[in-house]
């Protein structure tokens, strides 16, 4: 008896082990199949399981998998939707997808009991009908999905890319494809006035974080079919969508190809802003000089597109990039084209003066005070000496202390809430300057120099170019302290040499002055509107003329 029991126990154990091993191998094989799945298969259960595994639906609370049944030709098909809650328009999903698939198809939208008649002919009293065999794929796309954008895809990679940007996926049993339905509906900021590029006369619209809204703003200004907007994905994880915009009949082909090449050949995990892209595609990153224009104004971007340049828009960022850039671009303001050329040129002249004041005035003050006092009139020299009589610190310490303090006040004004930011800047500068003079830490003349320098820096229209000049200012302060005018002259020679050596996407940064080309078309100052006949020649555009030689034909009739 005990031997029989032992034999039975052994047999049961062997059978259990074999069954367990068979079940384990089957589950492992299924798991490997699911993990290695790359294309949509006909089995709806396999697709469903793969989707749940890839999106971790047991953990992710915003991933929605909606299973339902679709009826066609008196047959029921299992189906499911996949989308991300909060990124789709729930009304579109309910009314245009679920209702159409679950309810409308049962109201004989397509005659499911008969094939579709293509043509009918009668010969010898015999009717001959050509019919089209029922196709579930065509039936769904043509009759059941009243959505303007529906794509058929068979790759899970493409399917997941669509879901991640706000699309909805439809999987149906027996079909080796999935339907990518555009039902984006996430919240976004409305179009508002630009915050950092304010103008008095001109459009008051700015770019936003949504890339399609930004491209539509450009399309609304440029009503031309030659405006090309190409999409490129950057980032292996973020898959950030970037749009490369250019005028096909104007922009230089080599320039467009170079921009595409640089943007497309970035091997990074994530791209989050246009500022990151700017650093990745600039020619020389070691210099603080910006080589790409950044703007939040659609009218400014459109103007550069008309001139033959290329614009790159990054999804999720309200600033677009314009390339190539020259020195004259950073002195220009979007308001210049809206003003008479006399007013615009006067403003540009003030900006040129403010540029030199921003990075040269403190260094010149240090050089004159330490090395070249003989250049000052006698009365002014006595006044300077008297103001510094009770100051115990050397002039280099004074000016560095005040310049750094001014930069701290400016930075603090940017970081605090906007209603009190300007107040902190003004009050802080007044209180700090008065207290420093009263305590004999700095001289009153130095306060005037620092204040004029700070005001001049605010007159520079481009924020990044102004930042560059603010950093450059400290270098010239040190040169003026070390070697006076000679040090400043050497610094200027080196600086101009660097400017002349820089190229932005093949275009010299100092164009049209180095090398000298047609200065009248793209120099610092503007010609009258009716004389701006040509585009910048350093861009080598396909169409050089921007208007007729006689644009005001009414004057000669």
Residue spans of the language-model regions?
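Generic detector of multi-pass transmembrane helix bundles and their immediately adjacent loops
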Residues: 364, 380, 392-557
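Flexible, active-site-adjacent loop/turn segments at secondary-structure boundaries
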Residues: 181, 189, 198, 205, ...
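Membrane-embedded alpha-helical signal segments
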Residues: 2-360, 378, 498-557
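Hydrophobic, aromatic-rich alpha-helical transmembrane segments
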Residues: 2-11, 341, 345-352, 388, ...
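Core alpha-helical transmembrane segments of integral membrane proteins
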Residues: 344-411
